[in-house]
């Protein structure tokens, strides 16, 4: 199996390099690649890459994910999240390749308290959500052999993440205020990559699984409770924190250019049934990431 990966250096892309390697021959690209074009600001170049390589599977982990920045550069977000996805979809259809693509809960209006189903009506709150929805539609229209995984609250051990930011602040400050009215499931890039590799194997033998899926870790939390778990684990590991008070505040306490959904819960039953997988509780992955952080780096 020949696999083409776009966005190899992002949170999910980095883990995909590991998870996809046993499936076959992997060509991994990013914006700086020189052998082939992996620059999503150049849709024609990216489409040409697909036609040259003629892969069996394309995994797209590249995107414009700066949610607030997208509000001030909607055309650039549209180019990366929709126009380029359409170019890939058309080229993939031409060469007979599968396309695996990641989307977001931001395609929904973010109200209510019920986990969103794949069949629920979309109504994005911001530019990022609008462009990601446009990318989904382009892929669905132009390439039948696709898997779209909507995910949420993605983190990775590599690079910056919410937990590391909270730990840094908790060492500097005695009091912190964290949002407690946004609900979701922190989902590890490791989990996304491993589930993707498994799904590709299933799709190769059962093409009828093509379609749209929700893919997040199990359970639900808030940013406030997520932070509380991080601090609890840090103290258990013997890390000294200056923090002695963690306040819960509403989203309105931190105004941002892009509106944020209150309800980022996603129903994953369809994914678990079709791919015969179990999605572990969010705490499993977060605790593992923290354990690695505490034992391998001077934080």
Curated annotation (Swiss-Prot):
Site positions per UniProt: Could provide a fine-tuning to achieve optimal pKa matching between active site and substrate? 104
Q: Which reaction does it catalyse?
A: dTDP-beta-L-rhamnose + NADP(+) = dTDP-4-dehydro-beta-L-rhamnose + NADPH + H(+)
Q: Name one GO biological process term.
A: O antigen biosynthetic process
Q: Which GO terms describe its cellular component?
A: cytosol
Manner of cofactor binding, per the entry note:
Binds 1 Mg(2+) ion per monomer.
Pathway terms, separated by semicolons: Carbohydrate biosynthesis; dTDP-L-rhamnose biosynthesis; Bacterial outer membrane biogenesis; LPS O-antigen biosynthesis
Coiled-coil regions listed in the entry: none
Q: What is this protein identified as?
A: dTDP-4-dehydrorhamnose reductase
- What is this organism's lineage? Bacteria, Pseudomonadati, Pseudomonadota, Gammaproteobacteria, Enterobacterales
The encoding gene is rfbD
């Amino acid at each position: 199996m020949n696999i083409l990966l776009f966005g190899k250096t992002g949170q999910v892309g980095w883990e995909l390099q590991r998870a996809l390697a046993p499936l076959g021959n992997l060509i991994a690209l990013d914006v700086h690649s020189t052998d082939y074009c992996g620059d999503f600001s150049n849709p024609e170049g990216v489409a040409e890459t697909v036609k040259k390589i003629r892969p069996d599977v394309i995994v797209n982990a590249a995107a414009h994910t700066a949610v607030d920045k997208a509000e001030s550069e909607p055309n650039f977000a549209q180019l990366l999240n929709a126009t380029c996805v359409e170019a890939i979809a058309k080229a993939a259809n031409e060469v007979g390749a599968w396309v695996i693509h990641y989307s977001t809960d931001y395609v929904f209006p973010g109200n209510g308290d019920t986990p969103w189903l794949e069949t629920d009506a979309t109504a994005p709150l911001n530019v990022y959500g609008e462009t990601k929805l446009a990318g989904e539609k382009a892929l669905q229209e132009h390439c039948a052999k696709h898997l779209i995984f909507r995910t949420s609250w993605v983190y990775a051990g590599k690079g910056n993440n919410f937990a590391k930011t909270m730990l840094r602040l908790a060492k500097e400050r005695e009091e912190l205020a964290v949002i407690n009215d946004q609900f979701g499931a922190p989902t590890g890039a490791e989990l996304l990559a491993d589930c993707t590799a498994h799904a590709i194997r299933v799709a190769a033998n059962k093409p009828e699984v093509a379609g749209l899926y929700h893919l997040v870790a199990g359970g639900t939390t808030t940013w406030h409770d997520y932070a509380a778990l991080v601090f609890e684990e840090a103290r258990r590991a013997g890390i000294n924190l200056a923090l002695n008070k963690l306040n819960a505040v509403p989203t309105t306490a931190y105004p941002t250019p892009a509106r944020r959904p209150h309800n980022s819960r996603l129903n994953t039953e369809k994914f678990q049934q079709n791919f015969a997988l179990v999605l572990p509780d969010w705490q499993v992955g977060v605790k593992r990431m923290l354990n690695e952080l505490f034992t391998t780096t001077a934080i």
